[in-house]
Swiss-Prot record:
Transmembrane annotation, as ranges: none
Reactions accelerated catalytically: ATP + H2O + 4 H(+)(in) = ADP + phosphate + 5 H(+)(out)
Organism annotation: Lachnoclostridium phytofermentans (strain ATCC 700394 / DSM 18823 / ISDg) (Clostridium phytofermentans)
Record localization: Cell membrane
General function of this protein: Produces ATP from ADP in the presence of a proton gradient across the membrane. The catalytic sites are hosted primarily by the beta subunits.
Protein name: ATP synthase subunit beta
Length: 472
């Protein structure tokens, strides 16, 4: 050991152990790097691997999490402390660009010029800096604006199993916010499919939305360290737009479950005792550190939309359950609605929002939303009777209610701009006032004579009436 110690220079270390994505590095006495410091390791193939200090083990050794593949590393390799955490570029020049967890461009273009660099580990805004305004963010998506309206500067969770349309809904939100509100968006791909990220990038170029968006990716083929930290990289870029540019920013995280999953993988390698269902014991702390930075201040706001994969459709799993605690609104996507061919497959009875309050949205909006939910709930209760005895056994009032419920169910669907190439239907942005008007008319029975098929994939109520007229 004495021989190794002689080789250790100031700020230089030697790799002593490699366990998958976690490695131990021994430094000279008194030259230990701090927790969260970035350390660079030059590989034999010329690439530089960045690792982040996670633990001090004693005996001048630190345990680090790799942000890239560890293949090609051997014990005894040199490692150099940088004296700072991982820092990433921020500012207007990052718009239209695509980065990895370290802030390096991955769109085959040069690194952005004239940018500041922020460390990815930062404190949440102080208590007195935070703003508590209640203002609705209009999305142009009927089911969202009516039943689970989003708060400007709030946190929204998109819950759903595999393949129910979370990513498509996120893409539509990015399109609508950029075209209708002119706001900046930061899209953070955490542990999802590279193909989807690639599709999203080219779709955004085609629609012209890319110039208002910064994209950060740590996809599912990358080591757990990158997937665990890429959320912080995207958040740091969004914080700059909020604090320095004074903008209202949309931060998309697809998928927040993968952040937890990566933490779980790393936690086991770091030697921590697993807790419930094998998750890391620090699950609440890690989630809190990320979520508390997503907030509105006096300068601007960050509205965050987070896709939440629900393992085996089990909402009581610790990962989605921990996420729930931080959210202002939940948009639940349901497989049973996908099976009906209704998109977006938002469950109108499971989705909730703290904003659905007459003091925030107004009496009319609140009443229409509650009436819609009441009719759909009653229809749900009647479905067992219909399945056993058939429609004929229902009372006249119930028959009318079922007919209206089926129209409402279909009218909650909507063609999306980002899905035009698949559906062949032009996308529709529906203002809140038109949404309320349409559902109010259905509830009042003004369209009882129109067949329910006309309501499927329509924009506002005028689109439905135009279809009826065209087919006469």
């Amino acid at each position: 050991m004495a021989d190794t110690n002689n080789k250790l220079k100031s700020g230089l270390g030697k790799i002593t152990q490699i366990i998958g994505a976690v490695l131990d590095i021994k430094f000279a006495e008194g030259k230990l790097p701090e927790i969260y410091e970035a350390i660079k390791i030059k590989k034999n193939d010329g690439d530089t691997l960045v690792v982040e200090v996670a633990q001090h083990l004693g005996d001048d050794t630190v345990r680090c999490i790799a942000m890239g593949p560890t293949d090609g590393l051997v014990r005894g390799m040199d490692a150099e402390g940088t004296g700072a955490p991982i820092s990433v570029p921020v500012g207007e020049n990052t718009l239209g660009r695509m980065f990895n967890v370290l802030g390096n461009p991955i769109d085959e273009k040069e690194a952005p010029k004239n940018v500041e660099y922020y460390p990815i580990h930062r404190k949440a805004p102080a208590f007195e800096e935070q703003s508590t305004q209640t203002e609705i963010l209009e999305t142009g998506i009927k089911v969202v604006d009516l039943l689970c309206p989003y708060q400007k500067g709030g946190k929204i969770g998109l819950f759903g199993g595999a393949g129910v349309g979370k990513t498509v809904l996120i893409q539509e939100l990015i399109t609508n916010i950029a075209t209708e509100h002119g706001g900046y968006s930061v899209f953070t791909g955490v542990g999802e499919r590279t193909r989807e990220g690639n599709d999203l990038y080219y779709e955004m170029i085609d629609s012209g939305v890319i110039n208002k968006t910064t994209m950060v990716f740590g996809q599912m083929n990358e080591p757990p360290g990158a997937r665990m930290r890429v959320g912080l990289t995207g958040l740091t870029m969004a914080e700059y737009f909020r604090d320095k540019s004074g903008k209202d920013v949309l931060l998309f995280i697809d998928n927040i479950f993968r952040f937890t999953q990566a933490g779980s993988e790393v936690s086991a390698l770091l030697g921590r005792m697993p807790s419930a269902v094998g998750y890391q014991p620090t699950l609440q702390t890690e989630m809190g550190a990320l979520q508390e930075r997503i907030t509105s201040t006096k300068n601007g706001s960050i509205t965050s939309v987070q896709a939440v994969y629900v393992p085996a459709d089990d909402l009581t799993d610790p990962a989605p359950a921990t996420t729930f605690a931080h959210l202002d609104a939940t948009t639940v996507l349901s497989r049973s609605i996908v099976e009906l061919g209704i998109y977006p497959a938002v469950d109108p009875l499971e989705s909730t929002s703290r904003m659905l309050d007459p003091r925030v949205v107004g009496e009319e909006h609140y009443k229409v939303a509650r009436d819609v939910q009441e009719i759909l709930q009653r229809y749900k209760e009647l479905q067992d009777i219909i399945a056993i005895l058939g429609m004929d056994e229902l009372s006249e009032d119930d028959k009318l209610l079922v007919a209206r419920a089926r129209k409402i169910q279909r009218f909650l669907s909507q063609p999306f701009h980002v899905a035009e190439q698949f559906t062949g239907l032009p996308g529709r942005y529906v203002p809140v006032a038109e949404t309320i008007q349409g559902f109010k008319e259905i509830i009042e029975g003004k369209h009882d004579d129109i067949p329910e098929s006309y309501f499927l994939n329509a924009g506002n109520i005028d689109d439905v009436l135009a279809r009826v007229k065209a087919n006469k």
